[in-house]
Amino acid sequence: VSLYYSDLEPRFYASIAYSGRVWECLTATEDANRDLSVFFYKDSENGQDLMNRELYHWTGIGVCKYVHPDDALTVGGSLKHKIEPTIRYADVLLWYAEALNEIEDGATYSFPSYNNQGVITVSRNTSQMSEAFRQVRFRAGLPDLSQQVYNDRNSFRRALKRERQIELFLESARY
């Protein structure tokens, strides 16, 4: 495998099918059809469309985000049903961090709680922004952003946009 694909963010390996990637294919009935290294280029049979041998990954990359390790398209193999969530908790956390970031400095808003048992007060609070944003990064095995990024509204807005693009890749999300 090319060193080009080494030492990248963990979500890359979970989402992108690159040339040389190993496909586990755990439901394949023959050992030879499991743990396959697949290379995408014109003269390789890997990655070609079975209906049209001229169709293949021209760029050398594809998508593996929704591929389960058990999935195998070989004789005796099977595909796992995937549950596609309507809304992800990671998206809710990113919305929350974004909403806090967009509150003007010094502004405070109060509104009744969902059960009318109290009042919720919100303001641009970088520790709350970090708490929400950090959960998304930690789940992916990534470190938190620096406090400087949280303190600067525009820097955090850029970081948030990039995080949303990577975390919600191929999930019909808009940025």
Model-derived segments and spans:
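Acidic/polar-rich alpha-helix caps and helix-coil junctions
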Residues: V1-Y175
